[in-house]
């Protein structure tokens, strides 16, 4: 099998794994590798309390997400239509995709229990001027690669001057329990891995120059990848100011010394107890997301965790947009297909666009 075909297989598997397997049901999955870094697994859940259900019952009544909506809480669904920006258009410049592999055996941070090859796919817009630092998106699980989804969106929205001329770095996760180690660990380790190992290789392999300006850097992911996106910006705010998350795993999935309740620390302690950081966030959760009927006290209800995080962001005065998806599941593809262009436009609001 040649490397390009292998790249496509790996990318499709990664996207299917997150957008399909994890979307199947409301029961919380076992933490890959166990909670607390490998010392446990799924714990039995308690049913949601009347108070929990009353909080969740408010979400379907949120105002509909309209074009150009600002900060706040919104809803979409129950019916969905793919955004026209996903379709490839004729008569506009089309960017290119460059793919390469990184061997885990050469990594100082994530060598893997078993060596593996990590696919890295890079979108470079046709309008990119060599040598000029480009703003960029860093996405988990190769999000946006399948069917050139993100490439088409960026082609169209850059041409329409709705987004700046930007690159996208779509990186596959490590296999098996490696994914949870990388994404669910609440620490700066993964962000530093990206900065010191992935991004230098991207510049070397593609010739693109990536901006160092945190205003020009966005992280993007779903499920554990959504938690990773926020973790990168939280711990390395000097590098990232923009975050986009679908069904973010802001729950007690992988505990650590600095986060005894895993990513649930974000709504529970990190955001409430710290000064406001210059982070702009778009976040989503679905009606039938993981743990939607479990007790908030278990810290394993994705709906309540995201709802509470949104509440804290509002109280602290963050620029954020929280979207509740009716008739949808975990990292539901129909939600992404409808909302991603508008989410990108919100996250990149106020960033300079040439010619606008």
Where are these regions (language model features)?
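Positively charged n-region of N-terminal signal peptides that target proteins for export
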Residues: 1-5
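Bacterial N-terminal signal peptides
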Residues: 8-20
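Non-catalytic cap/lid and distal C-terminal segments of serine-dependent acyl enzymes
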Residues: 32-356
